[in-house]
Amino acid sequence: MVEQAQGSLEEIERQFLDVAQRDGLESLQEDVKPDVKSDLNGNGEEKRDRDDEDRKKRKRSRSRDRGDRDRKRSRSRDRRDRDRSRSRERRRDRSRDRNRDDRRGGRDDDRRREPQEPAKPREPKKYRFWDVPPTGFENITPMEYKNMQASGAVPRGSVQSAVPVVGPSVTCQSRRLYVGNIPFGCNEEAMLDFFNQQMHLCNLAQAPGNPILLCQINLDKNFAFIEFRSIDETTAGMAFDGINFMGQQLKVRRPRDYQPSQNTFDMNARMPVSSIVVDSANKIFIGGLPNYLTEDQVKELLCSFGPLKAFSLNVDSQGNSKGYAFAEYLDPTLTDQAIAGLNGMQLGDKQLVVQLACANQTRHNTHLPNSASAIAGIDLSQGAGRATEILCLMNMVTEDELRSDEDYEEILEDVREECSKYGIVRSLEIPRPYDDHPVPGVGKVFVEFATTSDCQRAQAALTGRKFANRTVVTSYYDVDKYHNRQFN
């Protein structure tokens, strides 16, 4: 019976295990089998206790495993959340960086493509107006000016008070000439060299160097513009009208935008000028005129001193100039100035002769007080004097200009640079005003050269130059007085 029962139990157990394996319940094998066996062999209670403990251990183990898995899953979720959070933050950072780069990308690209140049130091303001002549004194050299001062023809201070400031646009217009009918194929350099050479060959250049600074050619319309360094040389350059260049006869004219000074030629243009010059005490004779000068060109030369009352250019039967003319100024006091300024002037290959046409006529109100024979505190009745190493430049600066430290330094630099072109400059002195105390030599510029010959070259070159719209007057100065700072 026991064996039969045991066989039945084994059969039941086998069937149960098959079902358990099929349902994935292998763990129940150990639980069921001991219980059945314990019931059969009488040790059921003890085995049940052990089985209960085993089940509890397995449950605790499974609970621990499940807890471990839950904690791992939780940590994994936390790690994934943190990773996703970091990824989102990195994406936001990259997005912000891209937006920032886009906003400033243009500026950054410009900086990368075009690196900023280092800031250049401020260049000193150029104070150079050497070749801008004051109205009424365009053709007067310092020596002629001294003679006018000695005769009392120009009052003290009249140069500065009578000279309006010339704007740069007016100055540029007055220094340009139109050149028409230019030959095909000519270039700017060739034309520039040609006119500069002609200016020197005809003795029309007033200083060393090239009188013409710039040439601009319009090949499509067959004309050019040339720009001179001074107004005087520009007027003289009009004498080249009709000159032959590379087989072509050039047309030299004033540009359309040219406007003469309002205080001179414009006044004369508004008032009719008589073609008959009657005999009077103020009638002047102008001889030695180049035959190629037209009536308008001669009138323009005379009008640089003031408006004309009457003018007559003597011509032959064919209308060609005979080389002399007669004129009278609207203001009789301008007669002496024009004579002193024009007489002996070199114009082309000829020298002008300007004098009173009626010497026996009695003149009225043409002489000025003798006290007017000084300018800037120096007697101009004498010439430049004996040549020394010291050159004194007068009528260049005013007290107001010397009071400003910035202007004073710029004047010093400008004068030194210009004088260095003619020789070695050892020292330079420009006396400055001091409060209300009188300072000897204010308004004069003293330049010490290395040699007397250097000083003579500078005197010859700077004579008649213009500085700040003022005619520069030159004179040699005693060496001992200069070194002792006796500038009176």
From Swiss-Prot:
Keywords, ordered alphabetically: mRNA processing, mRNA splicing, Nucleus, Repeat, RNA-binding
Highest taxon listed in the record's lineage: Eukaryota
Membrane-spanning ranges: none
Record carries keyword Nucleotidyltransferase: no
Gene Ontology BP annotations: developmental growth; embryo development ending in birth or egg hatching; embryonic body morphogenesis; germ cell development; mRNA 3'-splice site recognition; nematode larval development; spliceosomal complex assembly
Record region (Disordered): 25-133
GO molecular function: poly-pyrimidine tract binding; pre-mRNA 3'-splice site binding
Disulphide bridges: none
Key word Ligase present: no
Domain RRM: 175-257, 282-359, 389-479
Subcellular locations according to the entry: Nucleus
A single cellular component GO annotation: commitment complex
Xref: InterPro entries: Nucleotide-bd_a/b_plait_sf, RBD_domain_sf, RRM_dom, U2AF_lg
Chain intervals with Basic and acidic residues compositional bias: 25-55, 78-129
Family of this protein: Belongs to the splicing factor SR family.
Cited NCBIfam families: U2AF_lg
Assembly information from the UniProt record: Forms a heterodimer with the U2AF small subunit.
Task of the protein: Necessary for the splicing of pre-mRNA. Binds to the polypyrimidine tract of introns early during spliceosome assembly.
Protein name: Splicing factor U2AF 65 kDa subunit
UniProt lineage: Eukaryota, Metazoa, Ecdysozoa, Nematoda, Chromadorea
